[in-house]
Amino acid sequence: MTKNPSSDATLPKGIHRSWKLPDKSLGDLWDSIVMDEAIKKQLLSQAIVNFTVRPKVERTVLPLHGVILLVGPPGTGKTSLARGLAHRVAESFSSAKFRLLEVEPHTLTSSAMGKTQRAVADLFSQSIAESAAAGPTIVLLDEVETLAADRAKLSLEANPVDVHRATDAVLVQLDMLAERNPHLLFVATSNFPQAVDSAFLSRCDMVMEVPLPGKDACKQILVDCLNGLAKTFPGIGKLSSAHQFDVCAGECVGLDGRAIRKVVANALAADPQVAIDPNKLSVEHLRSAIRQAKQMRLQGGKQK
């Protein structure tokens, strides 16, 4: 049986994982990201247009590059959303055999002059192009600022010229692939969109912000996490209907989805008795962990 995803040494340099799509585990990721459904719908629609409209319309009419950029604070679920998006797109085309390639940008960078540029060019012109020629392909470019750094903000004295050349290579390859491979979609993510080169941003068909969750989303994330734990520790199941739970959920505003789930883990570890028997977890344990998490965020922000 072929393993999904493939993540071994046989993959080309720069490719971290390769998935056959659709894949239910990726669909679960899509469902786990709690955000405005209208935003999800728009994102999915944009990705589908890449495969229905882009191949049939001249680029002089619609200058589509096949690039979507997801931006937002760390922990908001951009990478999971991108993976889930790939599944949902493939699910929309039942007759086509889609593939998801995950790029690991840090394996492409090198201190040796010219090596980063060559590695980037080889990845795009060979590995990605070959996959796109074989069938519809979605490429996840996580932390895209690593490969497409803003050249206007880089000092040639502090940063090797190779970084500039790597960004040049990404832009050149995106243009070539957009021209030759209309059944190819890049989904990029960035925690620091201000660090992404403006020429890369201009090539994006959509730049979508993945925001921190609001009050209702915070509550939904917290309930989902507690319900999952309740399958193993039934006593936790009563917390979502407990007194002050809504207040507790409201206090999560300002935290990202990942941090909210970690808050629950921290609450379980707040007291030895709760750690021994998680059924004893209380709303007050949760509120204490939330206050601590927000205090740490506040201190971290002051240090920057």
UniProtKB/Swiss-Prot annotation:
A GO molecular-function annotation: ATP binding
Q: Which UniProt keywords apply?
A: Antiviral defense, ATP-binding, Nucleotide-binding
| UniProt cross-references to Pfam families, sorted A to Z | AAA
A GO biological process this protein is involved in? Answer: defense response to virus
The organism's place on the tree of life at top rank: Bacteria
Assembly description: Oligomerizes. Homohexamer. Forms a 1:1:6 CdnD:Cap7:Cap6 complex.
Its family remark reads: Belongs to the AAA ATPase family.
Per the entry, what this protein does is:
Regulates complex assembly in a CBASS antivirus system. CBASS (cyclic oligonucleotide-based antiphage signaling system) provides immunity against bacteriophage. The CD-NTase protein synthesizes cyclic nucleotides in response to infection; these serve as specific second messenger signals. The signals activate a diverse range of effectors, leading to bacterial cell death and thus abortive phage infection. A type III-C(AAA) CBASS system. Prevents the CdnD:Cap7:Cap8 complex (also called CdnD:HORMA2:HORMA3) from synthesizing 2',3',3'-cyclic AMP-AMP-AMP (cAAA). Binds and disassembles an active CdnD:Cap7:Cap8 complex, inhibiting the complex's ability to synthesize cyclic nucleotide second messengers. An AAA+-ATPase remodeler, in the absence of foreign threat Cap6 probably maintains the Cap7 protein in an open, inactive state. Once activated (presumably by a bacteriophage protein) Cap7 binds to and activates its cognate CD-NTase (CdnD in this bacteria) to synthesize cAAA, a cyclic nucleotide second messenger.
Name of the protein: CD-NTase-associated protein 6
Gene behind the chain: cap6
